[in-house]
Amino acid sequence: MKVTMHHRLGVLALASCLTLTGCMSSGSSSSDDDGDGPITIGISLPLTGDFSEPGKGVQRGYEAWADYVNENGGLLGRDVELKILDDQSNADRVASDYEKLINQDGVDLVFGPFSTRLVVPAAQVAKDYGFLFVEPAGAAEEVFTQGFDNLFYAAPAVADDHYNYLADAIEALPEADRPKTAAYAAMDDPFAMGTAYGLKTRLEEMGVKTVVDEVYPPNTTDFGSIAAKIADSKADVIVGGTQYQDAVNMIVALRQLNYQPKMAAFSTAPTNAEFPEAIGKETEGILSPTGYTPEADYPTNAEFVEYYTEKSGTPPAEDEANAWTTGQVVAAAVEAVGCADPDPECQQQLIDWLRENEVDTVVGPLSWDAEGRPQGAHLIQQYVDGKIRIVLPQEAAEADLILEKPPW
């Protein structure tokens, strides 16, 4: 069954209804007592530490979702309240945060954090309490091999598949025109490594030789030695399994060594609005997979972009959109089932409904396999004439793919 809500108070509205306030202090939300109080939603996010930049983007998306829904009639006719805790990018902290949100604060629902590293322990806590767990940013394969029957990833594709359209385009080239060598540098993070190594697998299958393969700790700031290895290799392609600041620092280091790859692809960072300024505006030709673009012609996306841009002054990026999508997915289930409380029966009904249905969202129609993997694909974006544009697949392209990156 496919769920499409076209009226204003539809999935979009239902997916934007959180006000940043406190939750209840008892083990059971007071909203359960009379059925017309606020629905409380608990979230832990990395607002400080290694993942703080994208974590704040997810926070902005959740808060915008909250405001919109509350301005448009609420969820099940009730306002929602959002409680956000800072997990400091720490896996132990995120687990204790969700324990507190569920067991002490008595939230009715939970939304997931940012990054695979934090999603896995958070999802385990949610599973232990029987809670539905929809998350915006845990895309690595290890998320889906833990036996989480309560988890749904609110984006189009898992990390290993993010570069599939780019790999297809390279494979379609005459063999003489394909790159011959590639260098890989990935953060020691399941998502970041998944994106880079998913493309690595495809390129190696085509005969592209791996000449550098580096994994670095999440707190790495000095990329001098890694950049030197890549520059010395003269690799045709550089693939960065990155989040944000690591990509910026890596690119700056590579430019300082005058390394000029024919193709450069980095995960996450290039879709961030601050990225061009951070690397000195030398962006032309840089590639990145994305699960979202403001220009996408999906139901409710234009309204989302208009609302978010008016509220924040800038269009939404991928992190904000995935957070909004998380709200849309949960809201669709809540409205369909007719409940939003921590009772195990209600939570199981929400889980079961999402297992059987497709939901239209701002990132496209989403459906999931039994482990919570979305059954879609990521777009490929590239900086063309100073703007980041969709270049793959061809049917969605806003600009032609630049096969050989200009010097940076």
Predicted regions and their residues:
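Extracytosolic ligand-binding ectodomains
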Residues: 2-6, 14, 24-408
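C-terminal motif of bacterial Sec signal peptides marking the signal peptidase cleavage site
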Residues: 19-22
